[in-house]
């Protein structure tokens, strides 16, 4: 008879179902490391095998839709790391795991460490864009932290020599693989910052497996790159290789060669820019000289128009025109007087009264005398005005000033000297005298002291 304390009676099916649900709901997904044994792959494409260690084993299944993502062929005795769900095969009551992903054990553990460190540093803000330093443009000296025997160094130097042979390069050799590599890389970064010889650093190496590149996933290296005052370009492996150093660095280059391309200037492009600048400068200079030459020609013509000899010639021409006009006016007056006289004589001859003739002759003589006197007076006044004009013109003429012993001195630029500050020792001067020019060289300049007038009470 059943005990009254027994509350539930399970069937075998229900028991297995309950256990399966407990395993799946309570345990969820787990990571398991172990050795493969009894590996089989039937026609269905599923994988069945056992994972074991020194003291225990568990049945495993990996269905076709999951195992097609595995990049290697599992082998008997191979250590692997799997992500799986725990379950129970109800018909037989066998406890087993259903695997979702599989990696070789070493690489899988490294990947876990990588993800954990990445999450940690990202949470601390080491990947934030606000901390990224701009690269110098152009760089005046490049530091390279890598193996002195690796292909990466050869690629970097080859690109720098091709693009910018004059760019100085300082190599900080260090191991890039092995247990000692992270410490050496950190010391190389610190040494480059302490010496402060370059303004940009390339930190990297050539391609390899995750284990080969692991030095650049080291937390010490990441923090050294973040603390560097010199901008750092990471150049680790190939374009598909992404390390913690890439996230922390100020800029990530897909390859070492690409890093060299980024930090260097293209010499051919610089040469083209210089040639273009020279061409623009030449065109600007030609335009400037043409403008100055045109301005000089204009000033020269204006100076010629204001030359004393030309002004005197214009005044002489004006006086000649006045003289001609005066002579023409006198001739016209004389002709008109003679014409009037002739008309009067004709009228007298027609009337022929003797007294009137005598009176007319007397009147004519008086008129002739008055006319002659008037003409002589006007001619004398005109001549006097003409003489005064000539005297005035001669008085204001620069040539008259020169004839009185004065001179006019001009500098090499053609400007008339008025003050001593316009010349200096060694300048060549041109002095205009009344009868020619004298060229002289300044031996010295002495400025006369100005005397101040005393104020009177």
Curated annotation (Swiss-Prot):
Keywords: Cytoplasm, Exonuclease, Hydrolase, Nuclease. Belongs to the XseA family. Bidirectionally degrades single-stranded DNA into large acid-insoluble oligonucleotides, which are then degraded further into small acid-soluble oligonucleotides. This is Exodeoxyribonuclease 7 large subunit. Transmembrane segments: none annotated. One of its GO terms (biological process) is DNA catabolic process. Its EC number is 3.1.11.6. One of its GO terms (cellular component) is exodeoxyribonuclease VII complex. NCBIfam families: xseA. It is an enzyme of class 3 (hydrolase). It comes from Citrobacter koseri (strain ATCC BAA-895 / CDC 4225-83 / SGSC4696). GO terms for molecular function: exodeoxyribonuclease VII activity; nucleic acid binding. It catalyses: Exonucleolytic cleavage in either 5'- to 3'- or 3'- to 5'-direction to yield nucleoside 5'-phosphates. InterPro entries: Exonuc_VII_L, Exonuc_VII_lsu_C, OB-fold_nuc-bd_dom. Heterooligomer composed of large and small subunits. The keyword Lipid biosynthesis does not apply. It is found in: Cytoplasm.
């Amino acid at each position: 008879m059943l005990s009254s304390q027994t509350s539930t009676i399970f069937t075998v099916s229900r028991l297995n179902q309950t256990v399966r649900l407990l395993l799946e709901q309570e345990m969820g997904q787990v990571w398991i490391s172990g050795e493969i044994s009894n590996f089989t792959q039937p026609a269905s494409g599923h994988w069945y095998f056992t994972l074991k260690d020194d003291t225990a084993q568990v049945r495993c299944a990996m269905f076709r839709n999951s195992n097609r993502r595995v990049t290697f062929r599992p082998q008997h005795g191979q250590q692997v790391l799997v992500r799986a769900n725990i379950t129970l095969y109800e018909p037989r009551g066998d406890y087993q795991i259903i695997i979702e992903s599989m990696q070789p054990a070493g690489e899988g553990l490294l990947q876990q460490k990588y993800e954990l460190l990445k999450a940690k540093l990202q949470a601390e803000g080491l990947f934030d864009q606000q901390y990224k330093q701009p690269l110098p443009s152009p760089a005046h000296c490049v530091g390279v932290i890598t193996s002195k025997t690796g292909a990466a160094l050869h690629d970097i130097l080859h690109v720098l020599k091709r693009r910018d042979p004059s760019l100085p390069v300082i190599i900080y050799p260090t191991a890039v693989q092995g247990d000692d590599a992270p410490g050496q890389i950190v010391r190389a970064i610190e040494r480059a910052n302490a010496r402060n010889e370059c303004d940009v650093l390339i930190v990297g190496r050539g391609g390899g497996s995750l284990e080969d590149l692991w030095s650049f996933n080291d937390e010490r290296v990441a923090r050294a790159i973040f603390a560097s005052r010199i901008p750092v370009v990471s150049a680790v492996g190939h374009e598909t290789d992404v390390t913690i150093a890439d996230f922390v660095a100020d800029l990530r280059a897909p390859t070492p060669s690409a890093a060299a391309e980024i930090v260097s200037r293209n010499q051919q492009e610089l040469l083209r820019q210089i040639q273009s600048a020279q061409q623009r400068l030449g065109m600007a200079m030609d335009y400037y000289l043409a403008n100055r030459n045109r301005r000089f020609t204009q000033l020269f013509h204006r100076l010629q128009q204001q030359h004393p000899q030309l002004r005197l010639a214009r005044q002489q021409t004006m006086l000649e025109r006045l003289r001609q006009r005066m002579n023409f006016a006198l001739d016209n007056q004389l002709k008109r007087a003679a014409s009037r006289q002739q008309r009067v004589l004709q009228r007298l001859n027609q009337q022929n009264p003797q007294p009137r003739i005598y009176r007319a002759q007397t009147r004519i003589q008086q008129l002739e005398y008055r006319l002659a006197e008037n003409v002589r007076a006007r001619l004398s006044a005109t001549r006097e005005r003409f003489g005064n004009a000539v005297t005035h013109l001669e008085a204001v003429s620069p040539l008259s000033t020169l004839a009185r012993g004065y001179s006019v001195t001009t500098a090499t630029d053609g400007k008339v000297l008025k003050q001593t500050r316009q010349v200096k020792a060694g300048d060549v001067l041109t002095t205009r005298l009344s009868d020619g020019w004298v060229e002289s060289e300044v031996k010295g300049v002495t400025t006369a002291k100005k005397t101040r007038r005393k104020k009177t009470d």
